[in-house]
Amino acid sequence: MAKKNTENNTLADNRKAWHDYFIEETYECGVELVGTEVKSIKNGKANLKDSYAEIRNGEVFACNMHVSPYKEGNIFNVDPLRKRRLLLHKSEIDKLLGFTSQKGYTLVPIALYLKNRRVKVKLAVAVGKKNYDKRDALKEKDARREIDRAMKNNR
């Protein structure tokens, strides 16, 4: 019997989210897709930049998640920016609702990946950074890079 591949294969990242937000918690959730969207995502035609999630009527939806139309999809293609339902347990949705009801918290998709041949979204509870926080993060990153460079040269 063949061994199942349980390795996560990242299809799209939202790198800007790490720059613009402090990530508090992450959740793994499924996403409701149409067949041609799955093919397009597997071809790497998804973009999470500027995407966010919102809770409406007890359901979580991903907004502004761009999935380019599948080129062989003809009439079966759907709107690239349509709202896609994210699949979570009710208790997780209630917890997320508690977070987002507080001021400053938002839900941001940070990764789109395959797990056991299913497309999953890594959803983060995030707090927006101020400009000075972003500058501090860049300074820390540069300092860390300098230290690593110095350590590498001393070997």
Curated annotation (Swiss-Prot):
Subcellular location: Cytoplasm
InterPro entries, A to Z: SmpB, SsrA-bd_prot, SsrA-bd_prot_CS
One Pfam family named in its UniProt record: SmpB
BP GO terms, sorted: trans-translation
One Gene Ontology molecular-function label: RNA binding
GO cellular component, one term: cytosol
Keywords, comma-separated and alphabetical: Cytoplasm, RNA-binding
Family: Belongs to the SmpB family.
Function (record text): Required for rescue of stalled ribosomes mediated by trans-translation. Binds to transfer-messenger RNA (tmRNA), required for stable association of tmRNA with ribosomes. tmRNA and SmpB together mimic tRNA shape, replacing the anticodon stem-loop with SmpB. tmRNA is encoded by the ssrA gene; the 2 termini fold to resemble tRNA(Ala) and it encodes a 'tag peptide', a short internal open reading frame. During trans-translation Ala-aminoacylated tmRNA acts like a tRNA, entering the A-site of stalled ribosomes, displacing the stalled mRNA.
Protein name, as recorded: SsrA-binding protein
Gene responsible for this protein: smpB
